[in-house]
Structure formats: C-alpha cells, structure tokens
Amino acid sequence: MRTQMRIRLSVMMFLEYFIWGVWYVTLGTWLGEQLHFSGQQIGFAAGTTAVGAMLSPFLAGLLADEFFATQNLLAALHGIGGVLLWYASTRKEFGIFYAVLLLYSLCYMPTMALTNSLSFRHMRDPRQEFGSIRVLGTAGWIVAGLIIGFLHVEPTAIPMRLAAGSSVLMAIYCLTLPNTPPLGSASELKLKHIFPAESVSLFKDKAFSVFAAASFLICIPLQFYYAFTNPYLNEIGVQNAAGKMTMGQMSELLFMLAIPWFFRKLGVKRTLMLGMLAWVLRYAAFAYGNNGALVWLLYFGIVVHGICYDFFFVTGQIYVDRKAPPALRAAAQGLITFITYGAGMFIGSWLSGKVVDMYVKSSTLGIVAHTWRSIWLVPAAGSAVVLILFALGFRDNEARFSTSRSTQAAPASE
C-alpha cells in the first residue's frame, strides 16, 4: 500500500472513532448532572448504539455492496448524523432526545463497518496492513478523551456538539476518499443476504453455542462500564475522569500484542476465561475503590480494560474466524456482533439503568448520589456467573491455534 493511501485511510479511521469517543464516554455525566435524567433513561440513551449495531449489518452490507459507492454513503451518513447529533444536544426532553439520538446511532453505527470495507478494498494485503490502519481509530478515541478531560466539559453539551462538528468534517473528508463503487448488482433487501441460513449451522457445534451464549451474557454487565463509569468517577470527585479513562484504550493496545503469546501458553478457553475474570475484578475494584487511599483500585479497574476487551472479544473474533468455513466467516462475525454489541448490550442498557435507579440516595439541592458499591457488585456477580458457566460448559478440541491471520484484522474496542 502506498504511503499516500495509508495516510488517507489512517485519517479516516482517526476521525471515525474520534467522533464516537468524544461524546459517548461522558454522555451519562451530562444527562445525569445537567438534564437530571434517571439511571434508566441514561441506560436507554447509551443503548441506542446497540440498536444501531443490530441493524447496521443490513444498512452497511447491502447498501454499499449493491447500490452506493462506499465513500458517498459514508459522507451522507456522517453529514446527516452530524446534524442529528447537534440537534440532540439542544433537547432537554428525554422522549425527543432519545428519538433523535436513536436516529443518529442508525446513521453512525453502519459507518464502522463501511470504513473497514473501504480500507480492505484499497489494500494489497489486508491481513498485514489493516491492523496498522485500524490502530489509528483507537488513537482517535484516546485523543478525544484527553481533549474532553483537558477542557473540563464533561457535564456539558460541548462533547456532543464537538462530535457533531467532527461528523460534518468527516462527511466532507469522505468525499475526498478514493472511489469505492458497489461490486454487486441491485437486489431486494433480505435477511439471508446478511445472515445466510448456513451460518446458523454453526450452532450445531456445542462449543460454538456455549461461546455465543457466553458472549451474549457477558455483554449485559458490559454496559454498566460503558454507560456509568464516567458518571461514577465524576460523582466521587475524580478529576479529569474522561482523560484518565483513556488509560483503558492505551492498555488495550499493549495487551493486543500479548494475545499471540497467551494463545500459545493458555489456549483459547483459558484466554477467554482470563478476559471474563478481568471483568469480575474490574467491577469489584470499582465497588471497593474510592478517591482516597484506595484510588489505585479505580486505576486498576480502568487499566484492566485491555485484558477485558482483548482477551475476550478479540479472542472471540479470532475463534469465530477459525471455526467458521471461509464462505461463512463474514456472516458469522456479523451474527456474533448482532448477539453481543446488539442484543447483549441493549439488554444491558436497560438492566444497568434499572440497577442504578435502585441505589439512588436521597438527593440534596438537586444533586443525586448513589450507593455505587451496591451498583458495581451487580455486574461483578453477573460476570462471575458467566465465567463459571463458561468454564463448565465450553469444550473445544481446537485448544490452541495460530493467530497470524486473524489478529491483523481484529477491530479494537473503544
């Protein structure tokens, strides 16, 4: 891949994840402190991206493959999304805010798959080249958090408006990207185009079924972290919470490099279990940490994000890639994404909000406080149950396998 093309794709990835990272992390803090939304309302708002993740395979797959050039579709989605996000930042009524944010998520979430597919189309060797491009997305998320923390604007609408402006900028930039026309011919939208019936046959394999069930279940407590970590840290007085939370993405980059070694030493099952164990330890650390002598527990809970994500989700992506026949790999990955980031996190958004509302203390002067230890022990217990069930139920003959092909293209979490 030529240097010029590498730079163009890297800028695209940086902007793609800067947009998401600049508003999503601090959303709960703004909604809770300034708009006084309930925990359940905050959870539902954070869960709009899960709805987008469930529907994005239809939008991203068929529209780009059959009807529109990818760069033009990206420009349209980001342009419309920027307008919607700005409008959402001006609303104070939950009903209207939620509806607009949901529409925005339906525009944004497909763009992650579209930026990946556009990159693949312009690479000579995607397996070797994609990783070095995709890492700029994580860098964009990190820079977004550092900027918001530095500006001290977490409990305001500024992060969302900055994301809206960045989205419009991204729309303009997408029009400069290399032409990526559709490869197929127009056809009607059908579920079988996205999830072929053959992909369901993977569930006949007991090990795959257990893995899929565990992936779904672990994503339910996952939403506690994404929706309520920033409000939690701000409520207990941690300064520059958004900036400090970027340590999680920094550790993610480091632990990504360690995955091949752990595969060789532990195999797939124990690597997956280590990832789930990290979730248990993280939530326990949040439950018992504080902004005083035990502040190190909070930092531990943030830094362990690299293990939480890489050792379960990236490992899981590689496992699916190895289990599925070549013709079904894309469909299988889409199915797992639907199960995890779609259905699992959608349920998690509802449950996390309900739990947070259960442990609201009496408010004074309009300031709402929470019994955070009780809140964090719920996802800790849930993650522990999933870990135990997975340990007892997962049996796979392919205990160890090479990661040379799959780790290059595994997307990083934010």
Give, region by region, the residue ranges found by the protein language model.
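Structural signature of the two symmetry-related core transmembrane helices
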Residues: 72-86, 270-285
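Juxtamembrane intracellular "pre-TM" segments in multi-pass secondary transporters
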Residues: 1-3, 178-213
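Helix-to-loop junctions at the C-terminal end of transmembrane segments
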Residues: 55-69, 151-153, 254-268, 356-357
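Loop-to-transmembrane helix entry
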Residues: 37-48, 128-133, 138, 158-161, ...
